[in-house]
């Protein structure tokens, strides 16, 4: 079986020829292009391996394409305001969007707007789910990074104030990027800020594990899958590689480029906007405001390929191509529903029923659920059938007992005859 193909998905601010382009990582061959608008920074996401979502820069809607119907915009998801960042749950059940200082959470199978979280004081700049979808992290221009438990956010108690699991407030300038590692509730989160630091946090405890100081503002951050290295993109175009195993026990560290010349990638002429690492950790992808996307060999720090775009790069990531992306005959399992702009129950002025959420926890549970009266009728039918069988069985029981007793008497007679016959044979005198 062939290994999954790694592809690069990227967008730029100009969007003259296309909104999004997909090309093969190692050969650079163009595979797909999508048209329909300009995707904003950190506004690109795959939904369940079937749809591509792009938050339009400065506009109040999200474009959605089927992965194979690239020339036809499937849907525009209208939002209450311009979307500043976007992400989707790994299982494809939820969509998160940052709109101004609030976080909007939609359920994909129904399109219901479940929750609006308002704990940031300025615009939300980044949103990321953990690998298992149990938590998500938000960061904003208010210098705060918040770790949320999805289970707590979806709780249905209206009297309980929704609060993040952790509030990380050690940054002193706006947070520009964040990265969630693997491990679910044990994952580590890296945050980058204009205060010239990158900080590493533990979701499980909320502790600050490491703070690295640079000599410039950091505009992007990522880690390899093994989490041996943090890659930090600077405002001048430099990319720094921080080895997490180099300073055991140190909580704070200052990165000096002149002392770490073998840990700096040089080539971009403007700030680095996005970073991504290949699955095996050997290739680093970077996008910049200098209108170029570069592929780097991590070990040698050499630039392997440069792709020039028509505008500043807003999104660039290395992903494993889902089967639907490479299969021309593939169609989504379910169409996207209409996404509501108002909270569930509030769209029709139904405040009385706003205290609970009806959650469908699977993509294929679309459709009308039976009412309680219908469920009661089904239960009564099952109970009646069970009682009927029991009554019928109780009437046949005496006849069955009589048959078994008769069979036992017959077997006893056969056994006695067999015993008598054997005794006569054994005791017969020999001639």
Curated annotation (Swiss-Prot):
Keyword terms, alphabetized: Cytoplasm, Developmental protein, Nucleus, Repeat, WD repeat
Pfam families recorded: WD40, WD40_alt
Matches recorded under SMART domains: WD40
GO cellular component, one term: dynein axonemal particle
WD repeats: from-to residues: 36-75, 78-116, 119-158, 170-211, 213-257, 267-306
Coiled coil location: none
Gene3D superfamilies registered for this protein in UniProt: YVTN repeat-like/Quinoprotein amine dehydrogenase (2.130.10.10)
SUPFAM superfamilies, alphabetized: WD40 repeat-like
Matches recorded under InterPro entries: G-protein_beta_WD-40_rep, WD40/YVTN_repeat-like_dom_sf, WD40_repeat_CS, WD40_repeat_dom_sf, WD40_rpt, WDR18/Ipi3/RID3, Wdr18_C_dom
Main localization of the protein described in the UniProt heading: nucleus
General function of this protein: Functions as a component of the Five Friends of Methylated CHTOP (5FMC) complex; the 5FMC complex is recruited to ZNF148 by methylated CHTOP, leading to desumoylation of ZNF148 and subsequent transactivation of ZNF148 target genes. Component of the PELP1 complex involved in the nucleolar steps of 28S rRNA maturation and the subsequent nucleoplasmic transit of the pre-60S ribosomal subunit. May play a role during development.
Subunit structure: Component of the 5FMC complex, at least composed of PELP1, LAS1L, TEX10, WDR18 and SENP3; the complex interacts with methylated CHTOP and ZNF148. Interacts with NOL9. Component of the PELP1 complex, composed of at least PELP1, TEX10 and WDR18. The complex interacts with pre-60S ribosome particles.
UniProt-recorded name of the protein: WD repeat-containing protein 18
Native source species: Mus musculus
